[in-house]
Every structure is written in C-alpha cells, then in structure tokens.
Design a protein with these regions (language model features):
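A short, highly charged nucleic-acid-interacting micro-segment common to nuclease
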Residues: 8-19, 97, 109
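Hydrophobic (often cysteine-bearing) scaffold residues that line and stabilize catalytic clefts
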Residues: 16-20, 72, 76, 100
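Active-site scaffold of zinc-dependent metalloenzymes
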Residues: 33-69, 82, 86
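Hydrophobic or amphipathic, alpha-helical segments that drive membrane association/targeting
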Residues: 1-13, 31, 37-46
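Post-HEXXH active-site segment of zinc metalloproteases
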Residues: 69-73, 85-114, 120-124
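Short acidic DE-rich linear segments
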Residues: 126-128
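Zn2+-dependent metallopeptidase catalytic core
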Residues: 13-35
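Histidine-centered divalent metal-coordination motifs
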Residues: 77, 81
Length: 128
C-alpha cells in the first residue's frame, strides 16, 4: 500500500511530519489497507465535509485551528472507515449511529491513546 500525503494550506509543520509518519504506521499495523490511499490535509473546508470525509482511496481532513490530537482522531476515524469498506467489504451505513460509525468513533479514540502511550515524547505536541 502506498500512502500519498497532500497538504493544501494545512498549517501542519515540518516538526509534526515525523509524528504523523509514526501515526500512519500505527494505523496500517492495526487496520491494514491493501490499496493505495491519498490523504489530503486542508486549511479550509471543502464542499460539505465536517472535519473529515472519505471516498474510496481518498481521505480529506480539515486541520485549521485544530489540535494535532483532534486531527489524528479524524484521520484514524476515516482510516477505519476505509478499512471497513475496502477490506471488510461493508456497505456504507448511516452518518449518525450504526455499526460502522460507532466502531470508527470508538477505534479512533483508542488509536490516539495507543499512540500517546507508545510515543510519550510526542504527548505535549498532541495539544498544539
């Protein structure tokens, strides 16, 4: 799986890049994807997205005025959805509630906490 990262006025600093790379490795370990994935980090909302959205093989994440921890949670949430649909072959469910959405919410929170325990040197940066 090849991961392509695009920054569109995201505000993510070079200092944060290494931290993001480690988080992507954790996501791939816990929820492995087979197909290539593009993640676009945005400084401004696109279309009707909330803080994140997913299309097949493409995730958009809003970064402006958000803590790194919140951005990570959104990335994880959408990554779990990508896994649900491409690996588990689940159908798209409701945006509010439902098995897919509830699992993505729960796993996203867990993945952020796992990352913080595994990389305590980044904990302070998570709140920037």
């Amino acid at each position: 799986m090849k991961l392509t990262i695009v920054h569109n006025k995201s505000g993510i600093t070079k200092k944060q890049f290494k931290m993001f790379d480690e988080f992507f490795k954790l996501l791939q370990k816990e929820f492995p994807l087979k197909e290539d994935l593009k993640i676009e980090f945005l400084g401004v909302r696109k279309d009707k997205m909330t803080t994140g959205s997913r299309l097949p093989n493409y995730i958009k994440v809003l970064c402006q005025n958000r803590m790194t921890r919140d951005i990570f949670r959104t990335v994880a949430h959408e990554w779990v959805h990508e896994h649900q649909h491409t690996i588990e072959k689940r159908k798209i469910g409701p945006d509010i509630g439902g098995k897919n959405e509830d699992e993505a919410n729960a796993y996203a929170g867990q993945l952020v906490k796992i990352f913080e325990k595994k990389y305590p040197e980044y904990v302070e940066n998570m709140y920037e």
